[in-house]
């Protein structure tokens, strides 16, 4: 699927580059007064530090970046971060499967954990359900690539993502925005800040978004890909004294969505000759039965209390409680014509979690050592209820003639399960800068983790119970990380680090036998060596950050759907895996008006020493790591036009390219997700005086080349070797924002 950029995309890029000629000349004349790149502050090490002083391969996106790239939810950032790969879960737009540096999870079940940790204001979010939904008042996203060791611990074996929301300003203020676009897209948001009274300030945010799906449903029910969501957030900041700061936030999301359309792409198998297929993207289909909406509701509370007990010591408490309730409908069999083939997979689950973290941050040895020590506790519980139905005419199956129209109704196993997970940890992170060598920074991190998991599950069909299972197990881990960083100059530093990572063990909640459901997974571990450089030069007009790494995984956890039976998901410790790779992030301020940002990621993955799995057919197929494209590339161009007396006119053009990637751990029928290219652009006019505030208006377009690309794939259905969803085609819209 090769990109054919539209004239609009090529024209925008040509205008942006061509317009630099006069600006470049002007910049040379005014070099002495030229501006540099802005400093980026991150909290990757649990304290505020400059991006350039943080020995981690990290990218940060502030509020302006989120608006510029049209990032409405976490899933949108993957096209701006090399070596980050995200896929929607097959039966939910709101659920994300996240892979970083080639490591991720194909399942979102309660009996296993993700490989990439996601945090909202420091609170760990255990389930990826709902991460594809919009978050109100999002201020910054930080992407930390690679295992995060002592400071984050369990389940950050691939990396971590920090989502930071806006805090109350303590002054009266208002922000609002309206958006409209094709496919009946509409979005509105408001954000209100109150003045600080008695040490208390508040921020209230609300967001409403609605859009028709990109595959029209010619039958009954919503379009495929419909979305209708509401999110709100109330944030309070209380400063009773100069030494105490209290932040509390309540957030909620309520999102309705149409099912993702899984298109039959290859010729049917096993006599399903009447099932139509098409390799090009379909724009409309006619399901055999009415399509129903899916819904996810999320609520969360977060309380952070920071107390400066002395000039060099702070105690911080982070308390979080979150709950979710999800009801999913999925139709895997809709086609352009009604075939009476019907495959439906309803799925319901609930989850709630509580976490408490206590940190002590400070300095000692006359400021030579910065430290963070802490204790962490986490508990979650939840349940799932799922069943799959297939209805088809017997004429689809030999030896029945094609005209034989009697329906065969099949109820596949009905699974009911519940899980309780508990985790605790103690950790310390110390950074020593010797007084005799201020350019050297040595880091030592230590962490002890313990996990307990209990899972109950049962499987039945049409009144017959196949099995019930009631199991529990526990795991623990000691890990270290060591870093040596050296400042070659004030603007150039290099680092080398060794990090151990840990992902807790679990059980297979999708198992189809008591034996498979009762067999525990061992914990997954990794050892990573990384070498990097962070540099700014040419009067801070060029920023270059790069890293190379090598990771060795033991007992890596892989899952896959058994051939011809999508309800049978095998999960086990496959053995050892090795990942080598690199990341390069380059930002250059070519002129005061033109900024170019380039990013590149490379991965070389292999799965070695594969243990003998339970399913013999897998022995004949190579094991691979899904979500690990060899190459990923991003380019972003920002141009500010010369002033013409009315606001500030800016153009952004961004491009992303990703190589093909596997979507299953074991290649069974030879399919994968082909590589693709995407072009986006945004033309905005800002700094417009309006009343007592300022306004901006913007015209934007996404996937300007109307690229046909796949998001995922399933090759385990008996009626087709491959069904897969396409990504959204070309879209456009207009934004209006106002603040005072």
Residue ranges of predicted features:
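Outer-membrane beta-barrel translocator/receptor signature
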Residues: 113-115, 127, 134-145, 149-232, ...
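Gram-negative outer-membrane beta-barrel transporters
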Residues: 371-374, 436, 442, 550-552, ...
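Conserved C-terminal beta-signal and adjacent last beta-strands/turns
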Residues: 6-9, 347-365, 370-374, 496, ...
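Outer-membrane beta-barrel domain signature, strongest for Gram-negative TonB-dependent receptors
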Residues: 221, 227-371, 378-380, 543-544
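Acidic, small-polar-rich N-terminal luminal/periplasmic segments of exported/outer-membrane proteins
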Residues: 35-171, 531
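Membrane-embedded beta-barrel scaffold of Gram-negative outer-membrane proteins
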Residues: 302-308, 314-332, 487, 493-503, ...
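N-terminal Sec signal peptide and the immediately downstream disordered periplasmic leader
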Residues: 1-81, 242-246, 588, 685-687
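Surface-exposed extracellular loop regions of Gram-negative outer-membrane beta-barrel proteins
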Residues: 256-268, 379-383, 452-457, 486-530, ...
